[in-house]
């Protein structure tokens, strides 16, 4: 397994993995009446293949198998870039999904390298891939002089245990898309 910068050709896998991280319920909260998960998947694939969106392949690292299949992905970017990067998603939600999400809560802020999404396909779980992806994102954050930050659903104690084991610490509580979340950070070593 190797961790590499994603390429445009990985866009569909990136979209599927982001949706896996979000859960179907959360994805359906992002679409308007008469729209489906397939519609959301197409929008996310287009955003992942774009140059400037929070879900762009440019903001993504992928875990590749020996035969170059995508096993997992992690999407991360500088918190200060959230609004500029999110614009493409908000525009697509309005135009293609029939949903105005302009009032969505900010999940990050300036001063952190935000891990937006991390997921591994079910067939590749329990192999340390999520940990490897997270370590790579933490390293990228620290090389930029920033702590790595993320949100974890309070209903997902397994993910919280993993993040804690990798050095993340609780900062505060946040609400995001109707879910109670814990904001955690992994600071640069002194």
Describe every region a protein language model picked out:
Residues 2-17, 23-29:
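A short beta-loop-alpha structural element at the N-terminal edge
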Residues 25-48, 94:
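Conserved GNAT-fold acetyl-CoA-binding loop/helix
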Residues 47-62, 80-85, 114:
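A short helix-loop-beta-strand connector motif used in the catalytic cores of GNAT acetyltransferases and
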Residues 62, 69-78, 114, 119:
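Conserved beta-strand in the GNAT
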Residues 78-113, 117:
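Conserved acyl-donor/pantetheine-binding loop and adjacent beta-alpha core of acyl/acetyltransferases
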Residues 111-113, 141-153:
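Conserved GNAT acetyl-CoA-binding A-motif
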Residues 115-125, 150-159, 176-181, 186-189:
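Conserved beta-strand-loop-alpha-helix junction that forms the acyl-donor binding cleft
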Residues 120, 126-139, 161-165:
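Conserved acetyl-CoA-binding loop-helix of GNAT-fold acetyltransferases
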